[in-house]
Amino acid sequence: PMMLTELVSAADRVGATSSRLAKIDALAELLSRADPTEIPAVVGLLLAAPRQGRLGVGWRGISALDIAHADSPALTVGEVDQALDALA
């Protein structure tokens, strides 16, 4: 399964360059590593348009949650997608 940190890293690389070819390379590399079943979730998260549609949850609601931070990155794209399913 694809780790969320992989998606974030690719998004950071895309945002950090003005080179269209570098953007394409970063996205192509990311999508080539994704399982075919993860592609809709990956694309939705990259576009800030999750496949679940508008959730009506903003930064204020998320920041109010009392959740401990993980010692190391552990979330997968699939787990984030499932959590968004539960909110939808």
What residue ranges belong to the model's regions?
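N-terminal nucleic-acid-engaging modules of covalent nucleotidyltransferase systems
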Residues: 1-88
